Regions:
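Periplasmic/extracellular electron-transfer cofactor-ligation site
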Residues: 68, 74-104, 129-137, 161-168
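Electron-transfer interface patches adjacent to heme c in soluble/periplasmic c-type cytochromes
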Residues: 104-122, 141-151
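Flexible coil segments in periplasmic/lumen-exposed cytochrome c-class electron-transfer proteins
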Residues: 136-181
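Electrostatic cytochrome c docking/interface patches
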Residues: 46-76, 168
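Hydrophobic membrane-insertion alpha-helices, especially the h-region
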Residues: 22-35
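N-terminal Lys/Arg-rich, disordered targeting/topogenic segments
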Residues: 1-15
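Hydrophobic single-pass membrane-insertion segments
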Residues: 33-46
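Membrane interfacial helix-start segments of signal peptides and signal-anchor transmembrane helices
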Residues: 12-25
Length: 181
């Protein structure tokens, strides 16, 4: 058998394996995309419609987010917040480390941050009044630019990006701070 014929046979026997590997790779990518899409869709309405109990205190189910308010909140967030907090809510790098002026960089509003650790009323107040001078907060207040309802709408958009655990915890804090157990 000639050298050229051996090379031709080797290529022919490798072709099915390459097709199989390529097909499996494509299947894996499609599977990952489907899982990601499902998780993203579930995050937007990540509620169980069950009462939330933490530390023995039960509050009503997490309120469902209104898709129209979430869309409006995204528009407002993009206009007023994204320049500092990031288009994907990611915040600034090293947001936990003080800057030379003593302030902190803008924190993320996604699940990696601490926004979901605070009740709604406190978050709206921070948005309205700006960063706390006691912490060298440099975030401007938006009370002149936005109504309280617009600030709450932005918060609805932010919440739409959290998972069910963050939503439930933040709702529990909000409800208990309002005396709703």
């Amino acid at each position: 058998m000639t050298s050229a014929k051996r090379k031709s046979l080797a290529r022919q026997s490798a072709a099915p394996r390459l097709w199989l590997a390529g097909g499996l790779g494509l299947f894996g990518l499609l599977l990952l995309a489907a899982v990601y899409a499902t998780q993203t869709a579930n995050t937007a309405q990540a509620t169980t419609n069950q009462p939330v109990t933490l530390n023995g205190i039960t509050v009503p189910p997490v309120p469902t987010l209104d898709p129209a308010r979430v869309a409006s909140g995204e528009t407002l967030y993009t206009q007023y917040c994204a320049a500092c907090h990031g288009a994907d809510l990611q915040g600034a790098p090293n947001w936990k480390q003080r800057l030379p002026n003593g302030s902190f960089p803008p924190p993320p509003h996604d699940p990696t941050g601490h926004t979901w650790h605070h009740p709604d009323d406190q978050l709206v107040a921070i948005t309205a009044l700006g960063g706390d001078p006691a912490y060298n907060g440099v975030m401007p207040g938006f009370a002149v630019s936005l109504t309280t309802d617009q600030m709450a709408t932005i918060l609805d958009f932010i919440k739409s990006r959290w998972g069910s655990q963050e939503r439930e915890y933040q709702w529990w804090i909000t409800a208990t701070s309002r005396g709703q157990p």
